[in-house]
A protein has these predicted regions:
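Intrinsically disordered, low-complexity regions
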Residues: 22, 48-49, 61-70, 75, ...
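Long, contiguous amphipathic alpha-helices that act as assembly "spine/axial" helices in icosahedral shell
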Residues: 1-69, 98-113, 235
């Protein structure tokens, strides 16, 4: 309404109205964004959990799902000594295993909430204090290090390893209701040799691409998204 009222001529108002109608009825773009969101959610869930269910029978979908197992090895999966807390000893066990196997860790991916909780722990405070050359004892009340200080101290202690903090929310819609959630499992830390390439994004040709259904309009977006729109005209 604001756009229409600001138009100076009837032709301008008509042009703006046509653009608004086109935008509202542009199902292809809306679906494309939804596919991007689902891909992002699957990526983050799969990387943190090692398993995803594509369009499955979970709390966000109905019907039969496709279970994808990333094949994380049990000997490469570690727990923590104290439930709900990540310590330097927990991290060192993973790094030591990687080194023994001839692998190197450069990045640790984790939820921002988990990172902040870890930064407030006693071992993180002591790590930052040691990095700054500060002397302390068991009675010293050390401050919580800033993110910058903790990252620098951690990188210095663990041969350049850095943190990649995840705080991504994804919005999905079901039965006309939009809900946001965070697909990364906050209970998981993933140790990677590099954050530049953690896998490949591949796709194939769908059956409908070569055998379209009558009465269905198809649109291909970004080379791999086949979006269909069905319409019916009653007499």
């Amino acid at each position: 309404r604001a756009h229409l009222s600001n138009a100076s001529t009837d032709a301008a108002k008509k042009s703006i109205l046509n653009r608004i109608i086109t935008r509202v009825l542009d199902d292809g773009t809306a679906c494309s964004i939804g596919i991007d969101e689902r891909n992002e959610a699957n990526f983050l869930t799969g990387l943190s959990d090692g398993i995803i269910i594509v369009e499955g029978d979970d709390d966000k979908n109905t019907g039969i799902g496709l279970r994808v197992d990333y094949g994380y090895l049990s000997e490469h999966s570690f727990g923590v000594v104290t439930t709900g807390e990540v310590t330097g000893d927990d991290i060192e066990r993973v790094i030591s295993k990687a080194n023994d196997d001839g692998n190197s860790i450069s990045v640790i991916m984790l939820a921002l909430s988990t990172y902040n909780k870890m930064r407030q722990s006693q071992w993180a405070k002591e790590l930052a204090a040691n990095y700054q050359g500060q002397t302390f004892n068991n009675d010293t009340k050390l401050p919580v290090p800033t993110s910058t200080l903790f990252d620098e101290a951690f990188s210095d202690q663990y041969n350049g390893i850095s943190f990649l903090k995840i705080d991504r929310s994804v919005t999905y819609e079901k039965n006309g209701r939009r809900v946001s959630y965070k697909p990364w499992n906050a209970n998981k830390l993933i140790f990677l040799p590099s954050a530049d390439n953690v896998g490949s994004f591949v796709w194939g040709t769908l059956a409908e691409a070569t055998n379209p259904v009558n009465g269905v309009e198809y649109t291909t977006v970004d080379e791999y998204k086949l979006i269909s729109r069905y319409s019916k005209t009653d007499p």
